[in-house]
């Protein structure tokens, strides 16, 4: 049962080159998240042709992109995102792999707990049912909406930062996605 849509060659080559360059060389706006093992740039691509490209993709699918956010996100070596579903504020989540090796693992369901929040995660003893790994391929990735959002997790077992490009459409009135707002994960 697939609850996400796989994407290939999502960005035109010139756009992906800009994103890859930012991941490899950093930007003046790159900063570490104070509570999570993340390196974020929430501003460099905001309201750019890259942001517009993604907005247009989702507008064509019928989504209102008025409250969309995008960011370059790096996960430090050794970090583990336990099994979780995204916050209810995320109407749509898009992830495009940029640089690394570790893909995202999706699960049909989870053992043991009826509800596991992003903050709590899921202990390894309660790993999910029927795991499927989405292969890390640069400029490929996936998207899902909150009506079909899957359980998912990943670990960065490599010695370097895992870089992805994230995009969310936010629900008005709900808390924001992971950025530097430490009250929302």
Per-segment meaning from a language model:
Residues 1-2, 179-185:
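Short, Lys/Arg-enriched, disordered terminal segments
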Residues 1-63:
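Non-heme Fe(II)/2-oxoglutarate
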Residues 38-42, 76, 185:
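Amphipathic alpha-helical surface "interface" segments used
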Residues 46-47, 110, 182-185:
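Noncatalytic linker/hinge segments flanking ATPase motor cores
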Residues 66-68, 73-181:
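Catalytic core of non-heme Fe(II) oxygenases with the double-stranded beta-helix
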């Amino acid at each position: 049962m697939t609850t996400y849509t796989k994407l290939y060659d999502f960005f035109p080559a010139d756009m992906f080159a800009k994103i890859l360059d930012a991941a490899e060389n950093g930007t003046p706006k790159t900063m570490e998240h104070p509570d999570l093992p993340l390196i974020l740039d929430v501003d460099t691509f905001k309201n750019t042709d890259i942001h517009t490209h993604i907005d247009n993709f989702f507008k064509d699918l019928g989504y209102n992109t008025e409250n969309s956010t995008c960011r370059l996100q790096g996960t430090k070596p050794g970090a583990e995102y336990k099994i979780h579903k995204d916050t209810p504020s995320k109407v749509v989540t898009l992830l495009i792999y940029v640089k690394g090796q570790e893909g995202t693992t999706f699960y049909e369901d989870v053992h043991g707990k009826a509800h596991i929040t992003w903050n709590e995660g899921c202990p390894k003893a309660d790993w999910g049912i029927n795991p499927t790994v989405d292969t890390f391929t640069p400029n490929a990735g996936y998207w899902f909406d909150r009506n079909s959002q899957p359980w998912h997790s990943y670990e960065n077992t490599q010695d370097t930062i895992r870089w992805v490009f994230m995009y969310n459409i936010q629900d008005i009135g709900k808390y924001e996605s992971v950025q530097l707002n430490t009250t929302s994960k």
